[in-house]
Structures are given as C-alpha cells and as structure tokens.
Regions:
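Short, Lys/Arg-enriched N-terminal segments with co-localized hydrophobic residues
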Residues: 1-6
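Core alpha/beta nucleotide-donor-binding catalytic domains of modification enzymes
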Residues: 8-182
C-alpha cells in the first residue's frame, strides 16, 4: 500500500494512541495491510522502526492488527551511531512506543561507516535485523516505505545505468537470505 499520505510524527502519535478512528482514509490502508499480512500466513514478524512517520504508521498498523488477531510483532530500531543525537533519538522513539504499549529493542551498530554511507548503513541494518530474526526464530521483517521511497529507488537505479529489469522499484517481498524475508 504505497498510497501517499500526509503523515507527521504528531499524527503518527495520535494513531498509535487512538487507532484509525480520527483518520477515516487510513482505514482503507489498514484493511489492505491486514489482507497482505493474512495472505503471508506468517504469524511472527520483526518490525523495523526508524522513528520516522512511515515506521510509526507501521507500528500503529501492527498494533491494531495485533489487538484483532494472534500475531507476534517485535519492534526493533537500529542505532547506527552516525549522528551525535542518535542515542537520544533512539531513546525518544523507545519512550514514544512504550507510552503506547509497544516494546522497542534498540540494536547498536558498532562498525564505523567510512564511505557510501547510505548503502553501507542499509547493509549493516539488514545484517543486524537478520541476526536478530535468527535469534528470535522469526523469518519475516516488516519495513515501512511510501510512494516517494519507491520513486527514489527507481531514480537511483536509473542514474546507475540499470537495464530494464533493474528499473523496477522496491518489491513487496525480498529474500535477504535463504531463511529471512523482508
């Protein structure tokens, strides 16, 4: 469900607390999300949280679904320790989710990233998430992306000279290894 939403952290916080009743358009997105999750036939997920509005909306979606069905969602934030405020920001996100009865596990990247920051950070993030999945015996990771993320992925691939097969945007499901799906 890559519908463009005007979602601020404030709106995400309201949704976490009250559900979707104050945002009628989000009910359609929730039902679409719920159907996609049901179709996977998977009951346990790691939910990757960044603290941005997309991932807070995902936290709200999973919290609502958990209250309705028997799913196990474990919430994880990767702190890359890149910025001075990274630890403070991670604590703030953890606090926000805790107030909304969501437990957040913060994993810390200890490898210093020297170049190609975005790509290396993404690879390290997925490595940490895969290790956490294996530790928790969970085979699926949920991440939040919006339409702008899809367009950005397409444009990055285009700028790198990708051929027709590489010009797709993000897939709904990607295998990270033989056991773990994103």
């Amino acid at each position: 469900c890559y519908k463009k939403l005007s979602m601020s952290k404030k709106n995400s916080s309201v949704i976490l607390k009250n559900g979707f009743k104050d945002f009628p358009d989000l009910n359609k997105i929730y039902l679409n999300f719920k159907n996609k999750i049901i179709q996977t036939r998977i009951k346990s997920f790691i939910v990757a949280i960044s603290g941005g509005p997309d991932s807070l909306a995902l936290a709200a979606l999973t919290k609502a679904l958990k209250s309705e069905k028997k799913y196990n969602f474990q919430y994880v934030l990767i702190n890359h320790n890149i910025r001075k405020n990274s630890s403070f920001e991670a604590k703030q996100v953890k606090k926000l989710l805790k107030v909304n009865n969501i437990n957040l596990k913060v994993l810390h990247n200890k490898i210093k990233i020297k170049n190609n920051l975005q790509s290396h950070a993404r690879n390290l993030r997925y490595d940490l998430l895969v290790k956490y999945c294996l530790k928790k015996n969970t085979k699926s990771i949920l991440t939040a992306h919006n339409l702008e993320d899809q367009v950005e992925t397409f444009l990055i691939r285009l700028s790198r000279g990708s051929g027709l097969t590489g010009l797709s945007a993000m897939k709904f499901e990607t295998k990270l290894n033989s056991k773990i799906k994103l």
